[in-house]
Amino acid sequence: MARKRAAGGEPRGRELRSQKSKAKSKARREEEEEDAFEDEKPPKKSLLSKVSQGKRKRGCSHPGGSADGPAKKKVAKVTVKSENLKVIKDEALSDGDDLRDFPSDLKKAHHLKRGATMNEDSNEEEEESENDWEEVEELSEPVLGDVRESTAFSRSLLPVKPVEIEIETPEQAKTRERSEKIKLEFETYLRRAMKRFNKGVHEDTHKVHLLCLLANGFYRNNICSQPDLHAIGLSIIPARFTRVLPRDVDTYYLSNLVKWFIGTFTVNAELSASEQDNLQTTLERRFAIYSARDDEELVHIFLLILRALQLLTRLVLSLQPIPLKSATAKGKKPSKERLTADPGGSSETSSQVLENHTKPKTSKGTKQEETFAKGTCRPSAKGKRNKGGRKKRSKPSSSEEDEGPGDKQEKATQRRPHGRERRVASRVSYKEESGSDEAGSGSDFELSSGEASDPSDEDSEPGPPKQRKAPAPQRTKAGSKSASRTHRGSHRKDPSLPAASSSSSSSKRGKKMCSDGEKAEKRSIAGIDQWLEVFCEQEEKWVCVDCVHGVVGQPLTCYKYATKPMTYVVGIDSDGWVRDVTQRYDPVWMTVTRKCRVDAEWWAETLRPYQSPFMDREKKEDLEFQAKHMDQPLPTAIGLYKNHPLYALKRHLLKYEAIYPETAAILGYCRGEAVYSRDCVHTLHSRDTWLKKARVVRLGEVPYKMVKGFSNRARKARLAEPQLREENDLGLFGYWQTEEYQPPVAVDGKVPRNEFGNVYLFLPSMMPIGCVQLNLPNLHRVARKLDIDCVQAITGFDFHGGYSHPVTDGYIVCEEFKDVLLTAWENEQAVIERKEKEKKEKRALGNWKLLAKGLLIRERLKRRYGPKSEAAAPHTDAGGGLSSDEEEGTSSQAEAARILAASWPQNREDEEKQKLKGGPKKTKREKKAAASHLFPFEQL
C-alpha cells in the first residue's frame, strides 16, 4: 500500500503532516535543491513538450554513478519542473494574459509531474527501499499540496468584472422552439419548391431536346425521299439486284446487297463539307465519287438505294437527348464508385472493392510485408488512401505502440497532403502479371521513367525506377474472384501482347482514375446512332440492316455499336410514319431503360399524329416484341422486379393491389421469394369506387383485402374509438367480385333517389329506367311550380377546400314530363327576357331624364350668373393686330377677367346694389315661389 500511495500520490486529506515533519522535509528539500543546481544548469526554456518529456523519462542514469544517482536525478527533474511552472505563472501574470486559461496549464503540469513520478517509481521498484519511497512522497508533497499558496492563487483568479447569467424561462423556450420550427418548416418548403421547379425545368428541356432531334430526323428522312436522289441511286445498282421484285426480297438478298455496297462505297474522313450546301447537294456529290465522309452519309446513301428499289425502308435513329435526371441527382451517392482504374481503363465495382477489403491479411512478420512497408512509401500511402476513411479514427494497436522512434518517423513520412497523394497516384501505373500463378492475386506498381526522376519530387530517389511489389495475400476465393474480374474488365485485352505496349497504353489510359470520369469519357465517344430497317414481305417482319459493319438481322450488333445509354430509338418510313422500336434493340428495356425515359403518356401523345394507318402490321410487331421479352430469363435482382411489365413480387404490391387467384402459378423464385406473372396482379377498389365505374359488389362477397381508410369519415371514426386506430377498416374488392350496376325504375312519376336525395350518373348506363336528363338551367324552379319531381344528376366529385364536393350536370326527370317541362321552361325564359327588357328600358329612360335635367340646370346657372361674363367678352376682341405672344397674353388676361366677373360673390354684390338703388321689393312668398324649381344648393 505504501508503494501504491507513493507512485500515485495520496489523497489531499492525508498529505497534511505535522508541523515538525514538514519543517524537516522542507529543510531536506532545500539542501537537495542546492546539490541539484550545482550539478545541473538552471533551465532557460519553458515547459518541455510531451515528446521530449517522454524521452527524458526513458533515459537511463549515467554509468558509473553511485546508487543514489537515480534518486538525486529524479529530485532534480521534479524541482526543475516546479521552477519552470512558477516562471510560467509569473510571466502569465505579468503579461496580463487571461487567467482562465492558466489553471488548465497548471493542471497539465501537475499531471506531467505525477506521471513522471509514477514512471520513475515503477521502473525502480525492485531496487529502492521503503525509505526511498517515503522520500519521494515527501519531496513531491510540498510541490503538489502547498495549501497557503494554492489558496492565495485561487483568490487571485476570482473575476473582477461582474458576470451576467441569462436564464431562459419556459415561455421563452417555447417561443424560441416555435419560431425555430416555423423557420425550419419554411426552409424545407422553400427547398422543396426550388427542387420541384428545377426538376420541371430540366424535364421540359429534355422534352424540347427530344422534339428537336425528332424534327431533325424528319428532315433527313424527307431528303432521302427525293425522286432525283432515287434516280441517281438506281442508276448505279447492278442489274442482278433490280430484277428481284420487292415481294421476293429476303434476308439473303439483303446480305448480298450490303456486301456489294460495302465493296463499292468507302468512307473518307478527309472529304470537304461545305456549310453552304444542303444535304441533298452533298449526297449528289457523294454518289459521283462513290465515297462518304462519315457513317451518317453512308447510311443515307444506302437508304436512297433501298428506296430506289421500291423497298419499304425505315430510317432508324437512336436519339440522344440530355439525361432526364440531372447530374446533381445522380451525384448524390458518395464516392464508393470512385476507385482506382485497372490497366485497361475500367474501374473496379463496389462489390469488388468490398471483396478486396475483406481479404484475410497475413501476419506482420512476413518478409514481403516488411520489404513493402520499409522500402516503398508511395504504394503504402496509396493503399492507405484507398481504404475507407472510417479506419482513420481507429485506435492504434499494441504493436504500433511498441514500435521504436525510427518506425514512427518512417510512418510520419508516409503521411502526405491529399494533393501530394493525388500527384503520386497519377504517376503510378498498375501492371498485371498473367504468367505466374503465385503472384496472380497481387499486382505490380511501377513509375514511368520520365516521371520517376522529377526533381520537384522531394521523396523521390535518384537512380532507375524500382519495381515495388505489394504483399501477396492468402489465396482465398474472394481474392481469386476479384483478380479474375479485374482481368476481365481490362477491355478484353490480349495477355500475350508485349509488356512495353501494355505499359505504355496503360500509362495513357490511366489518367482517368475514377469511374465517373470513365463514364463521361465513354459518353463522349459517339457511336453509330443510325441504321436501317427493311420490311420483308415473305417473313412479314422488319429486318435491321447495318451497312457500316455489313450486318443484317442482328439487333444486338446495332446496340453494341450505338451510343450508350440507348433510350429512344425511332423508325421513320418513307411516308413519314413514326414507330418507337426501342424494345427491339435495347436488352435492358424492361428493367433500366423505361425508368430513364420521359412519361409514357406524353411520349405516346407526341407520336400519335405520326402513327401508321397499317394497324395489322403494327399489331404483329407488338406481338414480336412481347415474344422477345418472354424469351428473356428472369431477373436475378429483387429491385428489378419493381414495376416490371411481366413479373411481380408480393413485396412490391401497392396498397390497392393483390394477386388473384391465390393459387396463381409461380414462374420461379428470386432469393426465396415467389415470382408471379404481372397478369395475376389486379387492382382492388372499395364499394364506392366500384360504383363510380358502374359496378356493384355482389351480395355475400367478403373483402379480398382490408386496408386502412383515410377519408374524413374513416378518420372521424378512428378518433372516436382510439382502440380502432390501428385496425384496417376499408374493405377492398376485386373485379371478379362485382357485377354491372342495375339502374332502378321510375314509378308513378317519381325519380328514384339515393340516400342523399340525388341520382348518381357517373356513366350513361346508370340512368334510371323511364327517366331522361335535361341540361337546362334553373329547371328545378319550373318543376317546383308545376309540382313535378326533378332531381339533380351527380356526375363526379371534385376535391377542393379540404373536402370532396359533388359535381352536378343537369336534372333527371321522368320521361312523361319532359315535353311539359320544356314548354314551361321556354315560357319562363320568355317572361324573364321581357322583364329584363323592361328593366333596361326603365333604366335608360331614367338616365335620359337625368341628363335633360342636368342640361336645364346648366342653362339656368348661365342665365343667373353669366351676364357680366358676356358683357366682358367684347372687350377681349378689341385688341386686334397683335403678335402671337401678345395675343396669348391678352387672351389669358381676358379669361382671368371673365372668371373674376362671373364669380358668385361679385354677382351677388351687384344684385344687392341694384336692389338698394330702387325697384319693387318681393315678398317672401314670391321669393319662395321663384325658388321652388331650384336645387337646395341654389337657394342659398
UniProtKB/Swiss-Prot annotation:
Gene of this entry: XPC
What family, per the record?
Answer: Belongs to the XPC family.
Tell me which species this is from.
Homo sapiens
Can you name this protein? DNA repair protein complementing XP-C cells
| Result of altering F733A | Diminishes repair activity and impairs DNA binding
Explain what the record says happens when changing P334H: In XP-C; severe; does not affect interaction with KAT2A and transcription coactivator activity in absence of DNA damage
Q: Which InterPro entries match?
A: BHD_2 (IPR018327), DNA_repair_Rad4 (IPR004583), DNA_repair_Rad4-like (IPR018026), Papain-like_cys_pep_sf (IPR038765), Rad4/PNGase_transGLS-fold (IPR018325), Rad4_beta-hairpin_dom1 (IPR018326), Rad4_beta-hairpin_dom3 (IPR018328), Rad4_BHD3_sf (IPR042488)
How does the record describe its quaternary structure? Component of the XPC complex composed of XPC, RAD23B and CETN2. Interacts with RAD23A; the interaction is suggesting the existence of a functional equivalent variant XPC complex. Interacts with TDG; the interaction is demonstrated using the XPC:RAD23B dimer. Interacts with SMUG1; the interaction is demonstrated using the XPC:RAD23B dimer. Interacts with DDB2. Interacts with CCNH, GTF2H1 and ERCC3. Interacts with E2F1 and KAT2A; leading to KAT2A recruitment to promoters and subsequent acetylation of histones.
- Protein function: Involved in global genome nucleotide excision repair (GG-NER) by acting as damage sensing and DNA-binding factor component of the XPC complex. Has only a low DNA repair activity by itself which is stimulated by RAD23B and RAD23A. Has a preference to bind DNA containing a short single-stranded segment but not to damaged oligonucleotides.
